[in-house]
């Protein structure tokens, strides 16, 4: 081991990190509400271990996507875990991550409405591994209250002239129907 990075108290990961372009990139789990520190995906320089960037899966006040949480204070925003490793697409220079549900599960217990989408919960996010900037996102289940956990593996593949990202649960369901 060349270096270590401690995760915030109460957080952890059940999968390993990914390596891309001189970075080690890791998601986390244990992202309950009632704490200021929210879940994030972070990248570290492979040589020094210094943090290169951090992307919050539950946006902080003023960040893009924060308006989708209504006026809920940060302390009461929870979820956005990424406990399954992301994937890296070297052709597009993007990492793809599945993000879990908002917490608590029921939108009413979050004092939100069905119009409050709670980004980036239940989403696939595509991040630039060099900067951590969001390239795009797709929310599979906006404002959901059933603990769907859309944190599945994300894989890139080609179909004719298109580059597609496949959501792990969709592939599994498709295979079971054949």
Residue ranges and their predicted role:
Residues 1-178:
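Noncatalytic, solvent-exposed loop/strand surfaces
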């Amino acid at each position: 081991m060349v270096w270590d990075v401690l995760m915030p108290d109460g957080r952890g990961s059940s999968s390993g990190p990914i390596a891309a372009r001189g970075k080690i990139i890791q998601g986390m789990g244990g992202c309950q509400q009632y704490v200021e520190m929210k879940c994030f995906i972070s990248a570290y320089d492979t040589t020094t271990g210094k943090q290169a960037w951090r992307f919050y899966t539950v946006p902080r006040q003023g960040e893009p996507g924060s308006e989708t949480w209504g006026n809920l204070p940060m302390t009461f925003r929870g979820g956005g875990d990424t406990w399954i490793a992301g994937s890296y697409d070297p052709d597009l220079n993007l990492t793809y991550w599945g993000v879990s549900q908002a917490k608590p599960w029921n939108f009413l217990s979050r004092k939100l409405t069905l119009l409050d989408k709670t980004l980036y919960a239940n989403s696939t996010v595509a991040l630039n591994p060099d900067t951590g900037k969001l390239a795009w996102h797709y929310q599979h289940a906006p404002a959901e209250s059933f603990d769907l956990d859309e944190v599945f593996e994300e894989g890139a593949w080609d179909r004719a002239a298109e580059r597609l990202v496949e959501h792990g649960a969709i592939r599994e369901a498709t295979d079971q129907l054949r």
